């Protein structure tokens, strides 16, 4: 397929061929890929024409890092495309109940946001991976500086949800946890393609490696 936009971390990609897996890949990885399940884009430096991906299995400890040719991608779903999907499923797990509850709060940010992690995977595939204790993983794209005061207000607005919410602010330089940015620490951990580093401003690259 022709990708109209660059792939980004947390995008779900279809089309990974089993033959592209390394020889040391566990059997469950080959099984999952063979079933046509999507892989998720992760942060890592790769050669041009390739993308770093992760394969997820049934359990939390089943995660496998791999790389995929962009030319093999047959379908791409971004976290933002999954927000409306919650309207068409039974919200029988806390993570989905929380998503429905906090949706107006995030819509009020007037910034692109989406669903990642287990909730995003289940909404995109209808494969049952959520459980009673699943967190709700979200992303919020903030191309411009998202103030610490605004971050703290958002953390407060998300309190009381049916499950723990892990929201990552996606900046042009990487990702930072909303709760960490809303805190009082001078430096926060910025996760980028070339590694993690402690920064005082996730929108300005200037700092030291973690």
Kindly give the residue locations of the regions a language model identified.
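Helical scaffold of the NTase/Pol beta-like nucleotidyltransferase catalytic core
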Residues: 1-118, 151, 155-163, 167
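Mature, function-bearing regions of proteins
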Residues: 71, 75-76, 187-202
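Active-site nucleotide-donor binding segment shared across nucleotidyl transfer reactions
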Residues: 103-136, 140-146
């Amino acid at each position: 397929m022709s990708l109209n936009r660059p792939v980004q971390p947390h995008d779900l990609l279809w089309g990974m061929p089993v033959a592209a897996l390394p020889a040391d890949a566990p059997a469950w990885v080959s099984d999952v890929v063979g079933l046509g399940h999507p892989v998720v884009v992760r942060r890592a430096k790769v050669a041009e024409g390739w993308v770093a991906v992760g394969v997820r299995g049934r359990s939390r400890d089943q995660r496998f890092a791999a790389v995929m040719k962009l030319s093999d991608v047959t379908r791409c779903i971004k976290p933002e495309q999954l927000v409306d999907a919650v309207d068409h499923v039974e919200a029988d797990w806390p993570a989905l109940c929380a998503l429905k509850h906090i949706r107006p709060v995030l819509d009020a940010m007037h910034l692109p946001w989406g669903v990642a992690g287990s909730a995003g995977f289940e909404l995109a595939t209808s494969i049952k991976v959520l459980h009673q204790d699943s967190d709700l993983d979200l992303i919020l794209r903030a191309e411009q500086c998202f103030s610490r005061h605004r971050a703290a207000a958002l953390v407060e607005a998300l309190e009381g949800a049916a499950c723990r919410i892990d929201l990552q602010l996606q900046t042009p330089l990487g990702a930072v946890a909303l709760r960490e940015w809303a805190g009082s620490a001078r430096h926060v951990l910025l996760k980028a393609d070339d590694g993690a580093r402690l920064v005082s401003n996730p929108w300005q690259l200037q700092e030291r490696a973690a």
